Amino acid sequence: MSDPQSDPKWPRSILIYSSSAAGGMPHYAHYQAQELARRGIAVTMLCRPDHPWAASPTRYTMLRGLPVPPVGRGLVAKALRVWCHIWGHFVLLGAIMQMRPSAVLFEENTEYFAAIWAWPHILLRWLGLPYIINLHDPVRALWFGPRWFGRLSLWAAYRVLKGGLIHGEPPAGAYLPRWMVTEIVPHGLFGHMAEREPPFDLRERLGIAPDAFVLLSFGHITDRKNQHLLVEAMAQVPGAVLVIAGPQPSTRQRGAAFYRQQAAALGCADRVHVIDRFIPDDEAAACFAAADAAALTYDRTFVSQSGVLQLAAQWNRPVLASGGDGPLRAAVEGSGIGIFVEPDSTAAIVSGLQSLMASPPPDPARFAAFRESASWEANVDGMLRLLRRVKGLG
């Protein structure tokens, strides 16, 4: 580990722990790594073999040593997923001891079962290794196992950390212990998706009329996105079509069959399309090219940022959004690239959707300004400021 007090170019090396392979998190970590490496910092990403950038040329080094958790509902599969999560942090420990990086970055919150894996990392932090994290969701309310174990895991995981990158002012209920230093940074753009040519016309494939208004709900199918309220809204807004596109990460939440049955019961099955699988990048381009607007209708507990907002901005697509007070609301209302409505309300969604359908699209200059502000350069500037702050250098 290099000594920042005697090294004006500190940090010279950063080890990124990227344990996910789906959704926006691995892309977020990739773009951070690319920008760090562009500045001459030696970056190694510890990731899974199925990381979405594993087969692509990168400016940084990929160490594909994390275990791949199995899929399935059985007890054995669940136990193996827990083991993979815990073991991954010991793989990280081995990589640290071998590489001796200047700092470690976690791609996202990783406190689950930290009561088991955190202790050697706490020791390394105490010995001077700075650990920082991307605080995509600073409100932590999900527990695994007994509540005491969950609270201990949360405390232990945050004891590893010295600082975090956050997308706005900490929302109400954020878990930020007194020792945590934070730095506000923008959520950068996933530019590789916008560079893809759509491989097909999604409207044509789904049989959607050219004059229909297509509302796209993109990404993981989860209850907190209020997609059932979007289906209810379709029944009340003739001329609107809903496309839900993304995988279902949990069988404990409403899935594709639920939304199809709901749409059939409400008489709008011909205007609700559910594509319940992982959407490759080129098909993501087809989804946004076909859409007139994107739905980010989170429930009131959501106080984070959404990578789908950045995707919508790249295609100049306005958003219909909801949620609690947090970075998503600030971004939508501050940029003027969409409408933010009351969360958890079908009536509010209907009103917002009708407003989008009746109004001309936002000025393209607003999208351009939003894209200009959502830069990875600014994100990494903030990361380096944070690292120097936690080392007492800035």
Task: List where the protein language model places each region.
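Glycosyltransferase donor-sugar binding loop
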Residues: H51, V241-F258, R277
